[in-house]
A protein has these predicted regions:
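Electropositive polyanion-binding surfaces
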Residues: 8-389
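Boundary/activation segment at the start of structured domains
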Residues: 1-2
Length: 389
């Protein structure tokens, strides 16, 4: 996939528009400590007023990278960041990532979705999309905070949580996280009603960390550390449900304005029915939503950047967005992007999985492990989890 190497040509980071208004929120991101491409952040306003507004703020390279530009061509070639244990090959140059990542301590260009809820019933009252600069107060790291932000602790006031050295950044947003967790549980339940069965979080996530080679590309001599993290933690749930709200809401907005986008759909959850990518807004049975795009990771996935351009056109032009959007209905470019993305993204994921297997064997070798107890997991047709020891 990289016949000319993984380096970047000398391309400056384009500057965002100077007339972006400053949002009156204090946002915070929730990511792993290794994440440098911070695409999304959240904010909550109006707690205790009866109407609470959730802000979902997405990094906005699409405000400055023009379709057809050299940076666009570069993104279209790479199509995604490539992840592997101890290393990654980013989709965009580091100068661009650093200019648009949602770093704490500054106001960052963002495409923001604001959803206002009735505080008691959690019914949706209003949705609006804005292009703005968003002050980010904190970059929270879930691997450092999961032991504090538990379901049990979120039911308490932060002053009652009996854990030493709670970071001030977490204290600042504790009440907001408590509301967001309640909202996320509500949203997940609504989707599960549509799905017809609950989502299954039985499989853990495995994190690979390599020691001994700094930030350089691994050469196989590093010491590998593998840690296990249970999926479905409160912070996981908050981030996941917020992303689903944004991706489904913006997908519907594109459809309402007659602006094409790149959608992910699934006709049913019957065995063998796969997720498809297309330019039509169709239901996603697995997610339990009427339509679903990828628009929340524009620093890491080219499809998200394409969809962000279309969302920006809607935010700027409203009912006439279809005339101003970079991609028109039945645009051959969109179909080409989908085809290339699916092939390339699949190859990247296979490469990552292969390297994870290699480093798992390295881990066994380095730790002198010759025999282990294990279990294999698979999902049955009814959605349950089967395990074999």
């Amino acid at each position: 996939n990289f016949p000319k190497g993984t380096g970047f040509p000398a391309l400056p980071a384009p500057q965002p528009p100077e007339d972006l208004p400053l949002a009156s929120v204090q946002a915070y991101s929730i990511d792993d400590s290794q994440t440098t491409e911070i695409d999304d952040a959240l904010s909550v306003t109006g707690l205790g007023s009866g109407q609470v507004t959730l802000g979902i703020h997405i990094a906005a390279p699409g405000l400055a990278i023009a379709p057809g530009s050299d940076l666009d061509k570069l993104g279209r070639q790479r199509l995604s960041t490539v992840y592997m244990p101890g290393y990654k090959i980013t989709m965009l140059p580091d100068e661009v990532v650093q200019a648009y990542t949602l770093d704490a301590g500054r106001a960052n260009p963002a495409v923001s979705l604001y959803v206002t809820y009735d505080e008691a019933s959690l019914d949706v009252l209003e949705k609006t999309t804005r292009l703005e600069r968003v002050p980010v107060a904190h970059n929270l790291r879930h691997d450092q905070l999961d032991h504090i932000v538990t379901e049990e602790h979120l039911a308490q006031d932060i002053s009652q949580v009996q854990i030493e050295n709670i970071p001030q950044s977490l204290k600042d947003v504790w009440n907001e996280l408590s509301f967001l967790h309640k909202l996320a549980q509500h949203l997940k339940h609504q989707r599960e009603v549509v799905r017809g069965k609950p989502e299954n979080f039985s499989r853990p996530d495995y994190s690979f960390r390599l020691q001994g080679n700094g930030k350089n590309e691994p050469d196989g001599s590093e010491t590998v550390h593998i840690s296990t993290r249970k999926r479905g933690s409160p912070l996981d749930l908050i981030v996941a449900e917020a992303a689903i709200v944004a991706n489904s809401s913006w997908g519907q907005m594109l459809a309402d304005f007659g602006v094409p986008g790149i959608y992910r759909s699934q006709a049913s959850m019957a065995p063998g029915v796969k997720v498809r990518m297309s330019t039509k807004a169709q239901p996603h049975a697995g997610m339990g939503v009427k339509c679903y795009t990828w628009a929340t990771s524009p620093l890491r996935r080219y499809v998200d950047l394409v969809n962000q351009w279309q969302v920006i056109a809607c935010a700027r032009h409203g009912a006439t967005a279809a005339l101003a959007a970079p991609f028109k209905p039945k645009d051959a470019d969109l179909f080409s992007i989908i085809s290339n993305f699916e092939a390339t993204y699949g190859a990247y994921n296979s490469y990552q999985a292969g390297l994870e297997r290699v480093w798992t064997l390295k881990y066994l070798e380095q730790n002198g492990i010759a025999e282990i107890d294990g279990a294999s997991h698979r999902d049955d047709a009814a959605g349950g989890a089967l395990a074999r020891a």
